[in-house]
């Protein structure tokens, strides 16, 4: 199987998001990379499902709460920017202050 660098990045994010979901299920608080991966995966999959940029920008802030991440992580993540593929092309989605 031959994957482009972009496809490899998407696969890595999806796998990291899956690990993050399993940790949340066990009650383990997420670290910075896990939180970023989970929010990024939410945006990528939402775009694939046909949701709008505005919806994803809004709802990306509901993926995680402060209680689900390690201390200091919310303060480290001011914005998450994701290039996602929508039915009408690739767009940049920015989720501001994603962990509330």
Swiss-Prot record:
Pfam short name (any one): Urease_gamma
Gene this protein is translated from: ureA
Catalysed conversion reaction: urea + 2 H2O + H(+) = hydrogencarbonate + 2 NH4(+)
Entry keyword annotation includes Cytoplasm: yes
Recorded family membership: Belongs to the urease gamma subunit family.
InterPro entries: Urease_gamma, Urease_gamma/gamma-beta_su, Urease_gamma_sf, Urease_subunit
One of the protein's GO biological processes: urea catabolic process
Record's keyword terms, sorted: Cytoplasm, Hydrolase
Protein name, UniProt field: Urease subunit gamma
Tree of life domain: Bacteria
Quaternary organization: Heterotrimer of UreA (gamma), UreB (beta) and UreC (alpha) subunits. Three heterotrimers associate to form the active enzyme.
Organism: Granulibacter bethesdensis (strain ATCC BAA-1260 / CGDNIH1)
GO CC, alphabetical: cytoplasm
EC number: 3.5.1.5
GO molecular function term, any single one: urease activity
Subcellular location: Cytoplasm
Lineage, opening ranks: Bacteria, Pseudomonadati, Pseudomonadota, Alphaproteobacteria, Acetobacterales
Pathway terms, separated by semicolons: Nitrogen metabolism; urea degradation; CO(2) and NH(3) from urea (urease route): step 1/1
């Amino acid at each position: 199987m031959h994957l482009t660098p972009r496809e490899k990045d998407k696969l890595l994010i999806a796998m990291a998001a899956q690990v993050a979901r399993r940790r949340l299920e066990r009650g383990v608080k997420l670290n910075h990379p896990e939180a970023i991966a989970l929010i990024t995966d939410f945006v990528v999959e939402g775009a694939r499902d046909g949701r709008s940029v505005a919806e994803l920008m809004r709802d990306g802030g509901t993926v995680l709460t402060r209680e689900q991440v390690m201390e200091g992580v919310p303060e480290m993540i001011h914005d998450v920017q994701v290039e996602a593929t929508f039915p009408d092309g690739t767009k940049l989605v920015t989720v501001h202050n994603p962990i509330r």
